[in-house]
Structures are given as structure tokens and as C-alpha cells.
Amino acid sequence: MDDRRPDLAKRFALAAHSNAVLPILLVLEILETTIVPFPYEAIFVALCLAAPQRTWLFVAVTVAGSAIAGSILYSLGAGFAEPLADYLNVQEAVEAYKSTFSERGGALIFLGGLTPVPSYFVNLVAGATGYPFATFLALFSSSRFIRFALLGLLIHLFGEAILAQWSRLPIVVQRTILILFLAAVTWWSIAKL
């Protein structure tokens, strides 16, 4: 067996420093924001811990992915809401909801991007109700920027201390924590489907 082969943590750190990780991160954020609910933040945090000097680049790529995904969902809502409402014969309910969304939509869009709950419903409804696209995109992108910039800032401030504590743990404890974390991520992903 070759002892010179880097362990998983070192390989992940090498990947975090590679430019090849950026398009992968972009695609993962697009998928997470549109159709595949999974805890994207875990990947984001791990990358930021592995390559702290690239945190703001990871924030920028994440916000770009969110903007692309939000735009896709907005377009789907705008394109398919009316035919679907006609098919289901719920035009009056849709019109009533449009007026409510026009009054409170900005807050809903902003909170949808800021919180860790899946935001696809808000993005679809924004398109379905005809909420102004530029305003939608500005609100959603700025809320995602705030969310991931704060997370990046916390990692920047406390990441080294967390890694130092982690490295002091016995390997069996580290592996147990990782297994529990993966089990929790798997349960969370399945529960969101």
C-alpha cells in the first residue's frame, strides 16, 4: 500500500484550492435551489474551512448559482401558472393570491432566500404572480448574499479554532461524528423529498 497517497481530508483540501471546484459548486447550488433538497451549507462550510482564503469566491459562486436557479424557477412560475390555474379551474384563488403577494411579496422573497428552508415555492410564486423580475432577482440575490456572507464571516472568524479542536479529537470520535453527520444529512434529504 502506498503511504504517500493523501487521505480524504487532504484530497478535499486540494480540491477546495482547485478552480475545478467552482463550476461543481455552481451546479450543486443550482440543483439545491431548484430540485434537489440537500444541505448545501455543509459543502460550503467544508470548502471554506479547507480553503479559507477562497471563502468570498465561494460566496460569489453560491450567490450566482442561487440567482440562476431562482431565475429558472421564476420563469417556470411565469410560464406555467396561468395554464395550470385554467386547467384546475382555480383562477379566482390565483387572482386573490396575486394581490396578497403583490403587497407582501418582497418580504417573502427576501425571507425565502435568507432562511435555510427551501425557497423554490417562493420563487415559483413570484413568477406566477407577475412580481417584477428585476426586483425579485435583486431581493433574492441580496438575501442569499447576506446568508452566505454571514456564514463565510463566521467561518473566517472561528474556523481555525474549530479545526484545531477537531484535530485534537481521537480518530474514533472524529469518525463517529462524521458517520452521525452523514446519517443526519441522509435523513434530512429523504425527509425533504
Go through the PLM ranges and name each one.
Residues 75, 79, 157-161, 185-192:
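Hydrophobic membrane-targeting alpha-helices
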Residues 11-62, 100-161, 190:
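Hydrophobic alpha-helical membrane segments of integral membrane proteins
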Residues 56-94, 103, 154:
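Membrane helix-loop-helix hairpins that form the core translocation module of multi-pass transporters
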Residues 161-167:
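Membrane-helix boundary connector in multi-pass membrane proteins
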Residues 85-109, 167-193:
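Selective transmembrane alpha-helices of multi-pass membrane proteins
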Residues 32, 69-73, 147, 151, ...:
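Alpha-helical transmembrane segments of multipass membrane proteins
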Residues 1-15:
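Short, Lys/Arg-rich, polar N-terminal cytosolic tail immediately upstream
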